């Protein structure tokens, strides 16, 4: 396998070494390309002469799952490069990245998914000298680095211009010490979802106490599955005034039993909090009783699989249907049929933030086709085996009692016919 890229020749030798050399003279210049050796079984990279890298080196060695020796890349001239996104993604045998130590990264703006899936990588200390002043994007840089334990090389990174670091340490399951991140400048950080998802050894997050989160909008899944995380007091001073998404932020943090440090968080702009504390070890949610939920549209299962007995937000959100007594309601079924229902006095009922409500039983008072003619039956749009029959009572034995699980099991309805007619599932 061989070819030409720019003014460079490349060959893959019998021993699976990728050799890149100038076509003529002592210097060769690579151009942006679909790198033909991606997803191959090359084991080594060797540069001959001076090789100048292009501005974009995205996914250059993507899924080169047998690559172990890339030491020759230390000679690569990267002074023009500003995008190395996914360059070593999927290089699951790559352990030694010392060849990166003296790279000129002063222009680099995007390092997203650079080491994605580098399962053998244990330390990133060679990155300690990197000039990162122009970094903007750092999503998933170490995602899936399941052996990574030493991130001391990141201590002096200039992160003042980074806007997004979603998935940055996603499933770094051995990562325990994140103290090198304590001095990070996060004043321009906006997107932080999944940053520490699945860091199961992470116990001490005091390094994050100094983070500037004033601009952060997305925090969803940030600490999900951090099974050892017990103390979140370092987050008590976080400025969350810009946050809009906190979905599953602490989901399955099974050791977390005290959420009182979050008492003072500003949640007035948060729209999504579903599953936020799902599966945590908490028994009392009173600490967040004062949270402003005026912007919320989803609180589904926020305390599901916990020992919290009373959801403090229930009293803040009035139901869209009567909480007691019987009443009539409407729903839309398949083929546009409109069903008039009688919700009996003993029916359990629920609603979240919108107009859609749920109950566990109802009597069918009438069924009408889109053309206005009556019908005897109507079929649920979500369950073709659930049939409404004129004059009969239907029930939903699997009715979900969670007030804020708007799309959960139950007989869904609206309080007025027009809302039912306008609804599209």
PLM feature segments, named:
Residues 1-348:
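Negatively charged
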Residues 311-425:
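Short, glycine-biased loop/turn motifs at secondary-structure junctions and
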């Amino acid at each position: 396998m061989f070819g030409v890229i720019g003014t460079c020749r490349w060959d893959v030798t019998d021993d699976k070494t990728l050799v890149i050399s100038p076509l003529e003279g002592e210097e060769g210049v690579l151009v942006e390309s679909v790198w033909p050796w991606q997803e191959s079984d090359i084991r080594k990279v060797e540069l001959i002469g001076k090789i100048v890298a292009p501005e974009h080196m995205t996914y250059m060695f993507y899924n080169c799952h047998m690559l172990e020796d890339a030491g020759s890349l230390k000679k690569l001239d990267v002074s023009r490069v500003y995008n190395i996104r996914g360059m070593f993604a999927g290089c699951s045998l790559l352990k030694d990245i010392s060849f990166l130590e003296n790279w000129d990264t002063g222009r680099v703006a995007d390092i997203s998914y650079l080491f994605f899936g580098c399962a053998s990588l244990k330390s990133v200390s060679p990155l300690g000298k990197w000039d990162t002043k122009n970094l903007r994007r750092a999503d998933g840089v170490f995602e899936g680095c399941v052996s990574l334990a030493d991130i001391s090389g990141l201590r002096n990174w200039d992160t003042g211009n980074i806007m997004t670091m979603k998935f940055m340490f996603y499933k770094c399951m051995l990562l325990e010490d994140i103290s090198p991140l304590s001095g990070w400048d996060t004043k321009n950080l906006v997107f932080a979802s999944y940053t520490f998802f699945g860091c199961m050894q992470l116990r001490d997050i005091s390094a994050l106490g100094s983070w500037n989160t004033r601009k952060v909008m997305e925090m969803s899944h940030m600490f999900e599955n951090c099974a050892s995380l017990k103390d979140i007091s370092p987050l008590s001073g976080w400025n969350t005034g810009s946050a809009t998404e906190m979905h599953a932020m602490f989901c399955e943090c099974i050791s977390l039993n005290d959420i009182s440090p979050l008492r003072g968080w500003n949640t007035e702009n948060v729209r999504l909090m579903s599953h936020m504390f799902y599966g945590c070890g908490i028994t009392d949610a009173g600490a967040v009783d004062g949270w402003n939920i005026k912007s919320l549209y989803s609180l589904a299962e926020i305390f599901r699989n916990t020992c919290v007995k009373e959801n403090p937000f229930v009293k803040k959100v009035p139901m869209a249907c009567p909480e007691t007594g019987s009443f009539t309601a409407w729903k839309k079924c398949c083929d546009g049929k409109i069903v008039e229902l009688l919700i009996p006095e003993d029916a359990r009922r629920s609603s979240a933030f919108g107009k859609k409500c749920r109950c566990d039983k109802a009597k069918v008072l009438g069924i009408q086709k889109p053309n206005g003619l009556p019908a005897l039956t109507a079929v649920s749009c979500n369950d073709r085996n659930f049939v409404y029959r004129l004059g009969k009572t239907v029930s939903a034995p699997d009715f979900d009692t969670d007030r804020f699980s708007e799309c959960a099991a139950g007989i869904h309805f609206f309080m007025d016919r027009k809302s039912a007619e306008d609804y599209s599932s």
